[in-house]
Amino acid sequence: VLDLGCGSGILAIAALALGASRAVGVDIDPKAADVAFESAALNGIGADRLSVYAGDVLSDKKLAARLGPGQNRVVLANIVADVIIPLSAKAGEFMTPDGVFLTSGVIDGREDEVRAALEANGFAVVKHLERGGWHAFRGERR
């Protein structure tokens, strides 16, 4: 599992708690790694199962190479549409051929843009959920 924009690491930690063997998080905020490791420790998860990196996967090729190109069955991004849209062009590089890109954090009025970006970047949107003005998408590689 790869969590793009991991923040506190909550999605990666949840994935590990639900059975993922390993998770990797990345965030542009250098403080996110410390927070994610602290959150993981509080949930009994060690650094042997969770890795977290600071940086921008859109501009840092070395970081992108460290994130396991072609190795992640699931890529997560719970972040604003302005970030998900450009990430949709990059997410497929990190995924296995049968990979899934789960996005959330999209506010009302931006869902069509996110769907279009996912579809333009090789994802079939197989599920779209909306609750309380927030949208989430499940994109599968075509």
Protein language model features and the residues they cover:
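Short beta->alpha hinge that forms the Motif I/post-I loop of the SAM-binding pocket
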Residues: 27-31, 79, 106
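Conserved short alpha-helix immediately C-terminal to the canonical SAM/SAH-binding motif I
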Residues: 31-35, 83, 110
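Conserved SAM/SAH cofactor-binding pocket of Class I
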Residues: 1-57
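A short acidic, Gly/Pro-enriched loop at the edge of an enzyme's catalytic core
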Residues: 62-74
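Core SAM-dependent methyltransferase catalytic element
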Residues: 124-126, 130-142
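A short glycine-rich, Lys/Arg-flanked "PGG" loop and its adjoining helix->strand segment in the class I
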Residues: 85-100
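ADP-ribose/adenylate-binding Rossmann-like module
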Residues: 98-111
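A short SAM/SAH-binding and catalytic strip from SAM-dependent methyltransferases
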Residues: 73-85
